[in-house]
Amino acid sequence: DPATAFVAVWQDSSHVTGVDSPQPVVLRGEDASLALELAEEVVFLGLDGERAVFALDLSGLADSEVLDAVGNRGTFQDLRRIGPQLDRADGALLAYARAVLRWHRGHRFCGRCGAPTAAKDGGHVRICTRANCGVSHHPRTDPAVIMLVHDGGEHCVLGRQPRHPSGMHTVLAG
């Protein structure tokens, strides 16, 4: 279906256009064909209205190849850096794509027996390929909380990870 949408992820970076106001690059039809052919993993993210949306993992490509795969449109950016500039729906789409593809990269082998796993159910399950094992692996759904601790006025508590860029602070989570 030419309306089918694909969002690309490369080494945990999201495919976007623009610097000051980044927007996800959504590949469709012929524009998606090379990326789809080269993707290590293709995962169904869901429906946007009646249009299917998939995530493409291009992490196996060299940095000199990845832009060719997406038609030399946009750049790949760290979602933590561009996230605050994205609207809620775009940020959610890119975060979901990144998270599910990261899960796939980390679960290519069965945690029980060590055999390779294969994606099933649109990419939301990985099944052990060893016949006498066959364990189903699912993405983790850990409970988490994000909070804003404030004094009821203008002041709040923010945290900062040493790995984050200078000047980047966040609300607390855990």
Could you say what each language-model-derived stretch is?
Residues 126-170:
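N-terminal strand-loop-strand
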